[in-house]
Amino acid sequence: MINDGIRGGYSAAALAYAVANNPLMKTHPYNPAEKKVWLMMFDIVNQYGCCMLGHLPVSNFSFLEDPTVMTEEFISSIPADGDDGYLLEVSLEYPESLHDAHNCFPLAPEHYQTQLEDLSEEQRQTYTKIYGKETYKGSSKLVTTLHDKEKYVVHYRALQLYLQLGLRLKAVHRVIKFHQAPFLRRYIQHLTNLRAQSKNPFEKAIWKLMINSIYGEFYCPFFFSIKPTHRSR
């Protein structure tokens, strides 16, 4: 169940389009009769470090005997800094009323077996040009869709966000409860401060690596690091 919740990194190119109406721009005429529109690009750094500042799973992992006690009201009330955390396997409904608003960046990424009807017209033409009439077999991709989610494994804090943004909880199938604590906070804060005080590219890189490598070790499934050995007598 835990491995089902590990999906990797998601990237996408959205089709959202905006036109700036900025009085400070010299390359595009400003129209004072229209509303001011500013386009901004954000480069958000240290996201791995930010994740590890919070409460993380530590011990006492166990399945709840009755997962139905995890109602939407109860899930929404779980504190981010509480002693207990939860990993849930749920079914979610993606209301059609949210589709237009969420179209460029849907919630709850998942591994999905793509179908021919999922492709754009241009992609279908490209496929036909290359493979002719060969049946499209599809492949598993990490994607965001507006489909309902069945037996979707998710951390309770991510689920709280999904519910807050309008997804509906249909069912709770399994729940793992665990003790959580901010056991990495002081160390991550120390490395972050050292990175901020860096005076050259090498120092910035080494402190960044020491933060990100910890995240990577937590991300790797434990069984990947187990190497069976055989000793003959």
Spell out what each predicted region is.
Residues 1-233:
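Conserved acidic
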